[in-house]
């Protein structure tokens, strides 16, 4: 059972994993439940690891606790991956990563973009992108961008208060990501964002995202 008042991650799967890990080695009693790792044995005898995380939002650059906590979580996830895997392994890191990787992932309007940067609001601050870049440069591919390198009008999060999903053009951010190790690049077939589910009654402010791998 998940406590809906706190951060949490979950994984739904068709194949039973061989091993499930909850939490990072660096977690303590105060750490929210943000990390799940499932390891699968595939029919071709290869091993696939899927890590699902809910990365902290971070509030803003000046926040005394939330912003450092976001940085620490990114560092801890990177260190875990770096210690446990190599880029040639079959590894997926996915979830609400709370960072828009490139400017084409920002769809809140130019004035709002400038204001967020000026106010130090999180989601695409330069230092945040450095945290994410460290992971991708290790050997992870943004699967959506691999298939849609130039798209600038598809987003995964839309603010309820400003009714960003209902506006035309839609106003949102692409902050939910599926990263795959370079060892999975050749098996990645397509990727997208599901607006149909976001259009349902009482939806989440986030859209489902997906990537198809043929392994």
Which residues does each predicted region cover?
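Active-site regions of metal-assisted phosphoester/phosphodiester hydrolases
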Residues: 13-215
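Single conserved hydrophobic/aromatic residue that forms the stacking wall/gate
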Residues: 1-8, 12
